[in-house]
């Protein structure tokens, strides 16, 4: 293990932008809320043997802090407030909030503590897990192989898009959490930066160092936590949407739709929300069906879909993104976030399908009932039933 003991992470900003966006909102609105989150491997990988190495990395994370140049850079962005950034300057990861164990070969990780602190663990911890596992499993793989794979795919992409008007095609890097390594992600992003259709990255550290636009708004946990923050479960999604607009009335206005299925979301997404939010993000279910529902919803509300943006980010690769672009580009603005298929795309390397999801808020259960049943997460069957009833979802498949 000592050969891999060097810290994977070197910057507090080596995380997804929406984590800081949500953290500021939590800091201002829900300072005393406590949460718990758990790690899941959606594949059949037995990762428990890496528990000691991961625990070592968790301990090392307590030494990360916001540097002065990072603080100055964040201060220049239009949506961060001084009180939050001054607090973030003093923030340190607390390893006592994380338990890591080997449960008969299964990697068991649980996070708990104040939401304002726990919220920052997910993305860097997943990136650590991914990089540590790949260091052990694929020591022969390197950056050059990742770059070669990308170059070949860009040749195919050029052939696929020949003669196609690509002026409305916008691609973002969403690859931090399941990257092969920090070095691979940086190399891939630098190469993509040479393409006119590449518009930014979700990684704040890379955005700062490479002068890119940071991309991201909110994640499932924002909606999940409101299931216990809101006094009325049936109103929890609307409460989450409203609270976000309080924090960011004119910015970061892409709403995630699948915490409790797209249909349930659209019932809550009335004309005021639809007018004020800049667009929607797809993260599960059939993307064409989802996009058609979104466009139809805007039209029903009397809103021109051309004034809104649909962001696709579920298991995309370049070919899928082009297919969706061909289908929708004449009717709505589009952006595509690609993660694993860019930052962990190396021959003979199997990417990890890993997540960390909220399971409790203030000691009570929360759930994610997405448009892909395999992505559903909740321990408490009674709460899932209550959630289905509150959102009129009698036929949704059982939580796993």
Curated annotation (Swiss-Prot):
Give the pathway: Cofactor biosynthesis; NAD(+) biosynthesis; nicotinate D-ribonucleotide from nicotinate: step 1/1
Q: For this protein, what post-translational modification is recorded in UniProt?
A: Transiently phosphorylated on a His residue during the reaction cycle. Phosphorylation strongly increases the affinity for substrates and increases the rate of nicotinate D-ribonucleotide production. Dephosphorylation regenerates the low-affinity form of the enzyme, leading to product release.
Instruction: Enumerate the Pfam families for this protein.
Output: NAPRTase, NAPRTase_N
Record bears the keyword DNA repair: no
Q: According to its UniProt record, which reaction does this protein catalyse?
A: nicotinate + 5-phospho-alpha-D-ribose 1-diphosphate + ATP + H2O = nicotinate beta-D-ribonucleotide + ADP + phosphate + diphosphate
The family classification in the record reads: Belongs to the NAPRTase family.
Under what name is this protein listed? Nicotinate phosphoribosyltransferase
| Record's function text | Catalyzes the synthesis of beta-nicotinate D-ribonucleotide from nicotinate and 5-phospho-D-ribose 1-phosphate at the expense of ATP.
Origin organism is Escherichia coli O127:H6 (strain E2348/69 / EPEC)
Q: What is the lineage of its organism?
A: Bacteria, Pseudomonadati, Pseudomonadota, Gammaproteobacteria, Enterobacterales
EC code(s) of this entry = 6.3.4.21
- Residue positions, PTM Phosphohistidine: 220
Q: Which PANTHER family match?
A: NICOTINATE PHOSPHORIBOSYLTRANSFERASE
Which cysteine pairs make disulfide bonds? none
GO terms for cellular component: cytosol
Q: Which GO terms describe its molecular function?
A: nicotinate phosphoribosyltransferase activity
The lineage's top-level taxon is Bacteria
Q: Which GO terms describe its biological process?
A: NAD biosynthetic process via the salvage pathway
Keywords in alphabetical order: Ligase, Phosphoprotein, Pyridine nucleotide biosynthesis
């Amino acid at each position: 293990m000592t050969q891999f003991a060097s810290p994977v992470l070197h910057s507090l900003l080596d995380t997804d932008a929406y984590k800081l966006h949500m953290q500021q909102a939590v800091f201002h609105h829900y300072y005393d809320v406590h949460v718990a989150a758990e790690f899941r491997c959606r594949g059949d990988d037995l990762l428990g043997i890496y528990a000691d190495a991961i625990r070592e990395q968790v301990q090392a994370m307590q030494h990360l802090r916001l540097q002065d140049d990072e603080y100055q850079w964040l201060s220049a962005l239009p949506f961060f407030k001084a009180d939050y950034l001054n607090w973030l300057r003093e923030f340190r990861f607390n390893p006592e909030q994380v338990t890591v164990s080997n449960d008969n070969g299964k990697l068991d990780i649980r996070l708990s503590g104040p939401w304002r602190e726990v919220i920052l663990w997910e993305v860097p911890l997943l990136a650590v897990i991914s990089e540590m596992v790949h260091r052990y499993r694929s020591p022969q793989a390197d950056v050059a192989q990742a770059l070669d794979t990308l170059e070949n795919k860009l040749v195919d992409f050029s052939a696929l898009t020949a003669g196609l008007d690509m002026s409305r095609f916008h691609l973002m890097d969403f690859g931090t959490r399941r990257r092969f390594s920090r070095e691979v992600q940086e190399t891939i992003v630098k190469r993509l930066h040479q393409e006119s259709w590449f518009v930014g990255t979700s990684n704040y550290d890379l955005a700062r160092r490479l002068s890119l636009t940071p991309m991201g708004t909110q994640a499932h946990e924002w909606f999940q936590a409101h299931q216990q923050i809101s006094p009325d479960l049936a109103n929890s999604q609307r409460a989450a949407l409203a609270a976000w607009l309080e924090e960011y009335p004119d910015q970061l206005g892409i709403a995630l739709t699948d915490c409790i299925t797209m249909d349930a979301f659209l019932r809550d997404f009335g004309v005021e929300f639809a007018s004020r939010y800049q667009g929607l993000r797809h993260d599960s279910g059939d993307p064409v069906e989802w996009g058609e529902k979104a466009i139809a919803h805007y039209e029903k509300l009397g809103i021109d879909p051309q004034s809104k943006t649909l962001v696709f980010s579920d298991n995309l690769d370049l070919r899928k993104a082009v297919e969706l672009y061909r289908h929708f580009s004449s009717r709505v603005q589009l952006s595509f976030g690609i993660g694993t298929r860019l930052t962990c795309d190396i021959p003979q390397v199997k990417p990890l399908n890993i997540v960390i999801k909220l399971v409790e808020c203030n000691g009570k259960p929360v759930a994610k009932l997405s448009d892909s049943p395999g992505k559903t997460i909740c321990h408490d069957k009674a709460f899932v039933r209550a959630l289905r009833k509150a959102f009129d979802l009698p036929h949704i498949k059982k939580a796993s």
